[in-house]
Protein backbone atom coordinates (compact mmCIF):
# COMPACT_ATOMS: atom_id res chain seq x y z
CA UNK A 1 0.00 0.00 0.00
CA UNK A 2 1.33 3.45 -0.93
CA UNK A 3 1.58 6.17 1.66
CA UNK A 4 1.22 9.87 1.01
CA UNK A 5 4.28 11.75 2.16
CA UNK A 6 4.12 15.25 3.57
CA UNK A 7 7.37 17.20 3.29
CA UNK A 8 8.79 18.50 6.54
CA UNK A 9 9.55 22.23 6.70
CA UNK A 10 13.31 21.64 6.80
CA UNK A 11 13.24 19.34 3.76
CA UNK A 12 11.73 22.00 1.48
CA UNK A 13 14.36 23.38 -0.88
CA UNK A 14 13.66 27.04 -1.65
CA UNK A 15 15.20 28.69 -4.68
CA UNK A 16 15.22 32.27 -5.92
CA UNK A 17 13.93 33.10 -9.40
CA UNK A 18 14.22 36.31 -11.40
CA UNK A 19 11.46 37.34 -13.82
CA UNK A 20 11.81 40.20 -16.28
CA UNK A 21 8.38 41.78 -16.78
CA UNK A 22 9.41 43.82 -19.80
CA UNK A 23 6.83 43.41 -22.61
CA UNK A 24 5.04 40.63 -20.70
CA UNK A 25 1.26 40.47 -20.46
CA UNK A 26 0.14 41.14 -16.90
CA UNK A 27 -2.18 38.18 -16.37
CA UNK A 28 0.04 35.62 -18.04
CA UNK A 29 3.03 36.71 -15.99
CA UNK A 30 0.95 36.69 -12.80
CA UNK A 31 -0.28 33.12 -13.28
CA UNK A 32 3.23 31.77 -13.84
CA UNK A 33 4.65 33.65 -10.85
CA UNK A 34 1.76 32.60 -8.59
CA UNK A 35 2.34 28.98 -9.57
CA UNK A 36 6.02 29.20 -8.62
CA UNK A 37 5.23 31.02 -5.35
CA UNK A 38 2.70 28.35 -4.47
CA UNK A 39 5.13 25.52 -5.25
CA UNK A 40 2.99 23.87 -7.91
CA UNK A 41 6.02 23.37 -10.15
CA UNK A 42 7.61 21.03 -7.61
CA UNK A 43 6.97 17.30 -7.25
CA UNK A 44 6.44 17.61 -3.48
CA UNK A 45 3.61 20.17 -3.77
CA UNK A 46 1.26 20.07 -0.82
CA UNK A 47 -1.82 22.32 -0.90
CA UNK A 48 -1.77 23.25 2.79
CA UNK A 49 1.99 23.92 3.06
CA UNK A 50 4.29 26.63 1.80
CA UNK A 51 6.48 24.65 -0.61
CA UNK A 52 7.09 27.49 -3.06
CA UNK A 53 10.11 29.51 -4.08
CA UNK A 54 11.06 33.17 -3.89
CA UNK A 55 10.36 35.27 -6.99
CA UNK A 56 11.89 38.62 -7.94
CA UNK A 57 10.06 40.60 -10.62
CA UNK A 58 11.99 43.44 -12.26
CA UNK A 59 10.96 46.08 -14.82
CA UNK A 60 7.44 46.29 -13.40
CA UNK A 61 6.88 49.61 -15.15
CA UNK A 62 7.23 47.93 -18.58
CA UNK A 63 4.42 45.41 -18.16
CA UNK A 64 1.70 45.38 -20.83
CA UNK A 65 -2.02 44.78 -20.90
CA UNK A 66 -4.06 43.93 -23.96
CA UNK A 67 -6.92 45.82 -25.53
CA UNK A 68 -8.11 49.06 -23.97
CA UNK A 69 -7.31 47.99 -20.43
CA UNK A 70 -4.66 50.67 -19.99
CA UNK A 71 -7.42 53.29 -20.13
CA UNK A 72 -10.38 51.28 -18.82
CA UNK A 73 -9.01 49.06 -16.04
CA UNK A 74 -9.61 50.63 -12.65
CA UNK A 75 -7.82 50.08 -9.36
CA UNK A 76 -9.82 50.93 -6.27
CA UNK A 77 -8.75 51.46 -2.69
CA UNK A 78 -10.58 52.81 0.33
CA UNK A 79 -9.20 54.75 3.25
CA UNK A 80 -11.88 53.45 5.61
CA UNK A 81 -13.36 56.90 6.07
CA UNK A 82 -16.72 57.98 4.66
CA UNK A 83 -16.22 59.06 1.07
CA UNK A 84 -12.70 57.67 1.10
CA UNK A 85 -12.89 55.67 -2.14
CA UNK A 86 -9.98 56.35 -4.47
CA UNK A 87 -10.18 55.17 -8.08
CA UNK A 88 -7.23 55.14 -10.44
CA UNK A 89 -6.75 53.84 -13.98
CA UNK A 90 -4.07 51.35 -14.98
CA UNK A 91 -2.13 54.03 -16.84
CA UNK A 92 -2.15 56.44 -13.89
CA UNK A 93 -1.13 53.78 -11.38
CA UNK A 94 1.57 52.49 -13.72
CA UNK A 95 3.15 55.92 -13.88
CA UNK A 96 2.89 56.38 -10.10
CA UNK A 97 3.50 52.96 -8.47
CA UNK A 98 4.05 50.24 -11.12
CA UNK A 99 4.99 47.64 -8.50
CA UNK A 100 1.49 47.71 -7.04
CA UNK A 101 -0.08 46.57 -10.33
CA UNK A 102 2.03 43.41 -10.48
CA UNK A 103 1.66 42.73 -6.76
CA UNK A 104 -2.13 43.07 -6.88
CA UNK A 105 -2.43 40.78 -9.91
CA UNK A 106 -0.31 38.06 -8.31
CA UNK A 107 -1.88 38.41 -4.86
CA UNK A 108 -5.32 37.86 -6.39
CA UNK A 109 -4.13 34.51 -7.75
CA UNK A 110 -2.89 33.23 -4.39
CA UNK A 111 -5.13 31.67 -1.73
CA UNK A 112 -7.05 34.24 0.30
CA UNK A 113 -5.96 32.72 3.62
CA UNK A 114 -3.06 32.86 6.07
CA UNK A 115 -1.12 30.65 3.67
CA UNK A 116 -1.67 33.14 0.85
CA UNK A 117 -0.38 36.00 2.98
CA UNK A 118 2.69 33.95 3.85
CA UNK A 119 3.28 33.11 0.18
CA UNK A 120 2.95 36.77 -0.79
CA UNK A 121 5.91 37.70 1.43
CA UNK A 122 8.16 35.70 -0.91
CA UNK A 123 7.34 37.99 -3.84
CA UNK A 124 9.67 40.91 -4.49
CA UNK A 125 8.68 43.43 -7.19
CA UNK A 126 10.91 46.27 -8.36
CA UNK A 127 10.70 49.14 -10.81
CA UNK A 128 13.72 49.06 -13.08
CA UNK A 129 16.19 46.25 -13.59
CA UNK A 130 18.09 46.63 -10.30
CA UNK A 131 17.27 44.57 -7.21
CA UNK A 132 19.04 44.05 -3.86
CA UNK A 133 18.87 40.23 -3.97
CA UNK A 134 21.96 39.45 -6.04
CA UNK A 135 23.51 37.63 -3.05
CA UNK A 136 20.81 34.95 -3.39
CA UNK A 137 21.97 34.25 -6.97
CA UNK A 138 18.50 34.05 -8.53
CA UNK A 139 17.93 31.86 -11.56
CA UNK A 140 16.27 33.35 -14.62
CA UNK A 141 12.69 32.13 -14.92
CA UNK A 142 11.61 32.01 -18.54
CA UNK A 143 7.89 32.36 -19.04
CA UNK A 144 5.89 30.40 -21.58
CA UNK A 145 3.96 33.45 -22.73
CA UNK A 146 4.99 35.45 -25.75
CA UNK A 147 5.59 39.14 -25.46
CA UNK A 148 3.04 41.66 -26.64
CA UNK A 149 4.11 43.54 -29.74
CA UNK A 150 2.87 47.05 -30.37
From Swiss-Prot:
**What InterPro entries does this protein map onto?**
Ribosomal_uL13, Ribosomal_uL13_bac-type, Ribosomal_uL13_CS, Ribosomal_uL13_sf
Keywords for this protein: Ribonucleoprotein, Ribosomal protein
Name its species: Prochlorococcus marinus (strain NATL2A)
Query: Pfam families from the xrefs?
Result: Ribosomal_L13
Organism superkingdom? Bacteria
- Stored HAMAP family: Ribosomal_uL13 (MF_01366)
UniProt keyword annotation of Membrane present: no
Q: How does it assemble?
A: Part of the 50S ribosomal subunit.
Protein name as annotated: Large ribosomal subunit protein uL13
What's the gene? rplM
